[in-house]
Curated annotation (Swiss-Prot):
Start and end residues of each stretch annotated as Disordered: 60-83
Species lineage: Eukaryota, Metazoa, Ecdysozoa, Arthropoda, Chelicerata
InterPro entries assigned: Toxin_22 (IPR012627)
Family assignment from sequence similarity: Belongs to the neurotoxin 14 (magi-1) family. 01 (HNTX-16) subfamily.
Protein name: U11-theraphotoxin-Hhn1b
Keyword hit for Cytoplasm: no
Tissues showing expression: Expressed by the venom gland.
Length: 116
């Protein structure tokens, strides 16, 4: 009976000591994998950031190009008084004398172009 207890105790001590070694090994392995994962995530994050910056630069370039070429300067909307000599009516509008309403305020207003 004593031999069984001694054998059991010996096996138990070996299992615990080897289990601790495996636990330490596993901890070190997990730490290495975590560090590798962090470096991979940093690399992926930097790559994504570069792509986003390139895309943003392209979009800003297109916006600035568009604003220089095709954007209208401030214009006067429909039904707003305008100057006959310097009409700044928006595109599609013409500076004309009013027919009925507004004849007592100013002499010209921006109206939609009439097709003939």
């Amino acid at each position: 009976m004593n031999t069984v207890r001694v054998t059991f105790l010996l096996v138990f001590v070996l299992a615990v000591s080897l289990g601790q070694a495996d636990k330490d090994e596993n901890r070190m392995e997990m730490q290495e994998k975590t560090e590798q994962g962090k470096s991979y995530l940093d690399f992926a994050e930097n790559l994504l950031l570069q792509k986003l910056e390139e895309l943003e630069a392209k979009l800003l370039e297109e916006d600035s190009e568009e604003s220089r070429n095709s954007r209208q300067k401030r214009c006067i909307g429909e039904g707003v008084p305008c100057d006959e000599n310097d009409p700044r009516c928006c595109s599609g509008l013409v500076c004309l004398k009013p027919t009925l309403h507004g004849i007592w305020y100013k002499s010209y207003y921006c109206y939609k172009k009439r097709s003939a």
